[in-house]
A protein has these predicted regions:
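Short aromatic-rich membrane-water interface segments that cap or initiate transmembrane helices
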Residues: 50-51, 138-147
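Juxtamembrane helix-capping/reentrant segments at transmembrane boundaries
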Residues: 38-52, 103-116
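Alpha-helical transmembrane segments
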Residues: 1-30, 60-90, 124, 145-277
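Glycine/proline-rich, flexible active-site/cofactor-binding loop segments
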Residues: 104-141, 179
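A cross-family signal for N-terminal binding/gating loops and helix N-caps
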Residues: 30-35, 47
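Hydrophobic alpha-helical hairpins/lids featuring a short glycine-rich hinge
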Residues: 74-109, 113-114
Length: 277
């Protein structure tokens, strides 16, 4: 029963922290005019979202970090998961800050984000001491050598940006992360990695608490502060459970959901080339 008790406690605590923080944070973000910027070239149906508070990821990520540190001892794997998540949190926060405070709609340049993610990947590779083999279904373990580190960067960049692209549509990013985190929680329990299972459960709880305020009509968006960090956290779990091969499939399915949602909310659009954030 212990294997389910701690994850359940993490879901409840993280959801409670976000639910308690949201009624206080949303008015503050309104007061500071930290509103969502909608690109003029984007779908006209999304213009009504302009001004909706963003940077809600602050309460999501802090709730996850507090929850796992309260419930679990800080192991190397848990520390690495937190490092990757908080590194992407810092990147996302800076990106949102430039958008909403400096009023520059594009935020950080793509190459600046990539540089930040390369640094995070290098730190992960240095501290983790991960084996360089990749498990492939029906083929077993394949040693990639130094190619593994290129794969690690691809997983971090691809997964974090896949979540990032789903933000800005009511409930889509948080709902997507809940589904992926639940799946990874079960994988972690199956592998006997209880601390990582608690980490995934905290992600589920925090996103459930956030979904109450992000469901249509959204009162707040997580912004890059939350979406990049949650994507980075999922990538971290994939790397630490050595299931990196699953991440591209998850990223592709996330983008397909975003495409479908964009078409449903903007039927005249041929392609969701623009995110609303």
């Amino acid at each position: 029963m212990e294997m389910f008790t701690y994850p359940l406690a993490a879901v409840i605590l993280a959801a409670g922290l976000v639910t308690a923080a949201a009624p206080r944070l949303i008015p503050e973000l309104h007061k500071l005019k930290f509103g969502q910027s909608i690109r003029e070239e984007g779908p006209k149906s999304h213009q009504v979202k302009s001004g909706t508070p963003t940077m809600g990821g602050i309460m999501i990520i802090l709730s996850i970090a507090i929850t796992v540190l309260v419930i679990c001892p800080l192991t190397l794997e848990l520390g690495l998961a937190l490092l990757i998540m908080l590194g992407h949190f810092a990147l996302g926060f800076l990106d949102d800050y430039i958008k909403v405070v400096k009023k520059q709609n594009l935020g950080l340049k793509a190459k600046q984000k990539l540089l930040g993610q390369i640094i995070i990947a290098l730190l992960t590779a240095y501290f983790a001491g991960l084996p360089t083999d990749l498990w492939v279904p029906f083929a077993g373990n394949i040693d990639l050598g130094y190619g593994f580190y290129a794969l690690l960067l691809f997983v971090l960049v691809g997964t974090s940006n896949a979540v990032n692209l789903t933000d800005g549509l009511d409930g889509l990013a948080s709902g997507t992360v809940i589904a992926a985190s639940l799946a990874y929680m079960m994988i972690c329990l199956w592998l006997g990695k209880l601390e990582l299972a608690v980490f995934c459960a905290a992600m589920v709880g925090a996103c459930l608490g956030f979904l109450k305020y992000n469901y249509h009509p959204a009162k707040i968006f997580m912004g890059d502060t939350g979406s990049l960090a949650l994507g980075g956290a999922l990538a971290a779990i994939g790397i630490l459970t050595h299931t990196e091969v699953l991440m591209p499939f998850w990223a592709i399915s996330s983008l397909k959901r975003a495409r479908i949602s964009m078409k449903l909310t903007n039927p005249c659009s041929e392609s969701p080339r623009f995110s609303v954030g």
